[in-house]
């Protein structure tokens, strides 16, 4: 008898099977005709606000219906505090509030309307729009609201620096790189938004807008580095206007070449909104009209991010079909049965040709001898494949071909494995898109007030890569990569037993990821780091049997897990983590399973309004609409499968 069996909450097997069947049927209903899944990916109010402001920047014809729907979305997401949060029911955020107010005013909302008065008072009570972050300030500078003295100098000549330079573009993350290159062109040309309505937001400032200076030091920044870089910024501000014209022209040409090589068709450069928007504004500033092919392509890419409903609309930051499809395939394979397995195989068949095999992207600058073999997060993003997605896809393919007794995906698996092994950073961990992106001093640049300029190794991505390598046959005894990955995870565990989650919120996500990796790598379930993690997960279970965690757990003055209302996805992660640690019979697992069963709606799925994923900690969060559909199903099916072999 298991040590926990006498203290177990009863789970009715028939009811559990009904829950699994209902969730499976509902999940399959979201499948596209070609076999893949793509769910909505919602951020905060900033992206839809920026979309409105982009249209008016370019003086595009006003789409009254679309603007009305985006306006409805913005008004609904306004917080009780008067401003806009970064997450559902979250605290006031200055930059989100300034952009949302600006967009609503641009749409035509009266400044005397109750919601606008409330927003304006909330912004002014917190020091006014001068306290916006650096990217918001760039937008305001482009609109002429603040002067260019309010933003850091971004000399376009940076693109010509040699690779050994401490400020080379390949020393920052892909998302920063693809955003900054067109932004540098804008910073040099200093264009002015067309803004045919002449809308401004001077009323959000407590001082003359033209007197707004540079941002103060951000909390994550070191005084020494900050003062050094602020001094360099001051010097550049003096000399930048006097740099040789020919050098500037060559730098702009280099930036354009960089952009056009990575334009990525109608999926957009980097396949993320900020890059696409900056590219469109860059071409406009260079005098290219809206029929100029690269500009037109980039502009169409942006509209593919829109989600337009009956009453509301918003703009997504990017699309997530590879991630959604791969994780759905995992859930369906866990469910089992002929239909679910067949649909998972069709999803994997959709994924297979999307592997990047012939493009050496930006990652190859630091790993020139590695063959490509990764998958991107989006439909197409060949220059920027994602290690997390690649690991998840390879694991799903490996499981499928083992079940089928075939070698159908063997070549794809081998190339994915080879690429991931070659992308291991020197500290033993893996990052999301780059290798050895460890120049932490760059987060002290005036531009980096967000603290997200880099893509260093993280516990969650490292765990996924270790899981994949172990699943395909690499173990600590004979694999240097896995041994170093395990060592990285061992030393990054927090004292209370958790691991940080960079791309999911937060310590629940990181701990689930690592426990799965340790299990796959054959680490003894009695290992102290596993026992500490189990004890921690059990200790934070909510009264209702679920698990929930708040985004404020990312605060710099870390003091531990921050409880929030239970969510289906975070509960599923906790359950999958505990089961990976051999705790399927633990009473906490049964309580968590009961929570998921009780929270399941009549349509077979789970309602989850809270944000449980992370774009940039403390700056930008995500709500994957698919998370509440496939993760709970995965956990319930895993519980059923383990219990059926453990009674």
From Swiss-Prot:
InterPro entries: Hopene-cyclase (IPR006400), SQ_cyclase_C (IPR032696), SQ_cyclase_N (IPR032697), Squalene_cyclase (IPR018333), Terpene_synthase_CS (IPR002365), Terpenoid_cyclase/PrenylTrfase (IPR008930). Catalyzes the cyclization of squalene into hopene. Probably part of an operon y4aABCD involved in the synthesis of an isoprenoid compound. GO terms for cellular component: lipid droplet. Gene3D superfamilies: 1.50.10.20. NCBIfam families: hopene_cyclase, squalene_cyclas. GO terms for biological process: triterpenoid biosynthetic process. PFTB repeats lie at residues 67-108, 413-454, 530-577. Pathway: Secondary metabolite biosynthesis; hopanoid biosynthesis. Pfam families: SQHop_cyclase_C, SQHop_cyclase_N. The active site is at 388 (proton donor). CDD domains: SQCY_1 (cd02892). It comes from the Bacteria. Its EC number is 4.2.1.129, 5.4.99.17. Belongs to the terpene cyclase/mutase family. The keyword Isomerase applies. It catalyses: squalene = hop-22(29)-ene; squalene + H2O = hopan-22-ol. This is Probable squalene--hopene cyclase. Keywords: Isomerase, Lyase, Plasmid, Repeat. GO terms for molecular function: lyase activity; squalene-hopene cyclase activity.
């Amino acid at each position: 008898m298991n040590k926990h069996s006498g203290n177990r909450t009863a789970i009715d097997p028939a009811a559990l099977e009904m829950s699994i069947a209902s969730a499976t049927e509902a999940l399959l209903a979201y499948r596209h005709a070609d076999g893949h899944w793509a769910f909505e990916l919602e951020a905060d109010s900033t992206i839809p606000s920026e979309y409105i402001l982009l249209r008016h920047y370019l003086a595009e014809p006003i789409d009254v219906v679309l603007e009305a729907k985006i306006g409805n979305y913005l008004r609904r997401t306004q917080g009780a505090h008067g401003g806009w949060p970064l997450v559902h029911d979250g605290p006031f955020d200055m930059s989100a509030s300034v952009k949302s107010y600006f967009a609503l005013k641009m749409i035509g909302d009266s400044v005397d309307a109750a919601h606008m008065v409330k927003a304006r008072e909330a912004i002014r009570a917190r020091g006014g729009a001068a306290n916006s972050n650096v990217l918001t300030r760039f937008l305001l500078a482009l609109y002429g609201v603040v002067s260019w003295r309010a933003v850091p100098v971004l000399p376009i000549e940076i693109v010509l620096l040699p690779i050994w330079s401490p400020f080379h573009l390949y020393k920052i993350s892909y998302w920063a790189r693809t955003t900054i290159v067109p932004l540098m062109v804008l910073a040099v040309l200093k264009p002015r938004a067309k803004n045919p309505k002449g809308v401004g937001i001077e009323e959000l400032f407590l001082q003359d807008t033209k007197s707004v200076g540079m941002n103060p030091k951000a909390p994550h920044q070191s005084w020494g580095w900050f003062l050094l870089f602020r001094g360099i910024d001051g010097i550049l501000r003096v000399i930048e206007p006097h740099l040789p014209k020919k050098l500037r022209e060559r730098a702009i040409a280099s930036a354009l070449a960089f952009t056009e090589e990575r334009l990525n068709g109608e999926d957009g450069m980097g396949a993320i909104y900020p890059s696409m928007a900056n590219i469109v504004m860059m071409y406009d500033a260079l005098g290219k009209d809206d029929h100029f092919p690269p500009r037109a392509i980039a502009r169409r890419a942006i509209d593919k991010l829109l989600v337009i409903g009956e009453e509301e609309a918003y703009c997504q930051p990017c699309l997530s079909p590879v991630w959604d499809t791969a994780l759905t395939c995992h859930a369906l394979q866990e469910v089992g049965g002929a239909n679910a397995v067949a649909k998972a195989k069709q999803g994997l068949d959709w994924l297979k040709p999307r592997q990047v095999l012939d493009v050496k992207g930006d990652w190859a600058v630091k790993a020139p001898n590695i063959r490509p073999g990764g998958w991107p997060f989006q439909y197409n993003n060949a220059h920027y494949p994602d290690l997390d997605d690649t690991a998840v896809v390879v694991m799903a393919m490996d499981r499928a071909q083992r079940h089928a007794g075939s070698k159908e995906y063997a070549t794809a698996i081998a190339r994915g494995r080879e690429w991931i092994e070659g992308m291991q950073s020197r500290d033993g961990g893996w990052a999301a898109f780059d290798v050895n992106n460890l120049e932490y001093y760059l987060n002290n640049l005036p531009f980096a007030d967000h603290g997200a300029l880099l893509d260093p190794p993280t516990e969650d991505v490292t765990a996924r890569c270790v899981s994949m390598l172990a699943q395909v046959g690499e173990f600590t005894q004979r694999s240097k990569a896995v041994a170093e990955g395990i060592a990285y995870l061992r030393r990054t565990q927090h004292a209370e037993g958790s691991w940080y989650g960079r791309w999911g919120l937060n310590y629940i996500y990181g701990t689930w990821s690592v426990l799965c990796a340790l299990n796959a790598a054959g680490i003894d379930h009695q290992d102290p780091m596993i026992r500490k993690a189990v004890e921690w997960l059990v200790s934070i279970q909510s009264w209702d049997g679920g698990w929930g965690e708040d985004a404020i757990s990312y605060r710099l003055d870390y003091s531990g897990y921050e409880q929030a209302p239970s969510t289906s996805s975070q509960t599923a992660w906790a359950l999958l983590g505990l089961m990976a640690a051999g705790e399927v019979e633990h009473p906490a697992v049964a309580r968590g399973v009961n929570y998921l069963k009780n929270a399941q709606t009549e349509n077979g799925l789970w309602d989850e309004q809270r944000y449980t994923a992370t774009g940039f900690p403390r700056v930008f969060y995500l709500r994957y609409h698919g998370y509440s559909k496939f993760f709970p199903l995965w956990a319930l099916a895993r519980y059923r499968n383990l219990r059926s072999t453990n009674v």
